[in-house]
């Protein structure tokens, strides 16, 4: 049996088997950045129910429940911070908010994080934890794939470093857009990384797929992920990458 106090001491990683539990966005930020350096931007951005969408629950009711449970307005937090003294633009997704799904607000925050990185020529770091596009926002959600990719491609074209961190899970529209195109793609151990589920994937290509093909280790072995990094080493790894990617002043 594991107790929360034990897990808090190990960054929510099981000390026995190494399983990485999902963590809230603000906890992730505290683990990565220099103490007290994070300045959140656009915390007041609020999703709207443009479609009047109702499934088992009306979308506004679902949003309110998620906001009360997480203390967030939506499933992403972005801002600027320092990591080992280097200023970065950081966007972190929170799976606890409607499965970390990307709607108009999440897409806008990812885009604004990229725009800030571009404007100030500071590294962009995005930590993904998402079930994909938010179905309650329909086409508005799908539009975010294009918007986020457009900004990220401009960041890369300007030779501003982009580090993508994929955590469990990184799936659907987030996988199909910005999460997989970092200058360096990092994944946590055994993270679920995929576009669609087993049944859909197998049915689409008409053949049985290999075991573990949707896990970080498979993607790493095929060159899709550059590094698999345990949570306890993630800050240290990012510090090393920033030192490598950022040119020293002339």
Model-predicted segments: where are they?
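Intrinsically disordered, low-complexity segments enriched in small/flexible residues
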Residues: 1-75, 80-83, 241-250
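Structural motif
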Residues: 5, 93, 127, 165-166
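Glycine-rich anion/phosphate-binding loops
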Residues: 62-65, 69-75, 100-115
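A generic local secondary-structure boundary/capping motif
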Residues: 67-68, 78-80, 114-115, 152-153, ...
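A structural preference for short, pocket-lining loop segments at secondary-structure junctions
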Residues: 81-93, 109-133
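Conserved mixed alpha/beta catalytic, RNA-binding, or beta-rich assembly cores of soluble enzyme
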Residues: 95, 102-111, 144, 151
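Short small-residue beta-strand/loop micro-motif enriched in glycine and branched aliphatics
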Residues: 98-101, 134
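Conserved catalytic cores of soluble enzyme domains
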Residues: 128-250
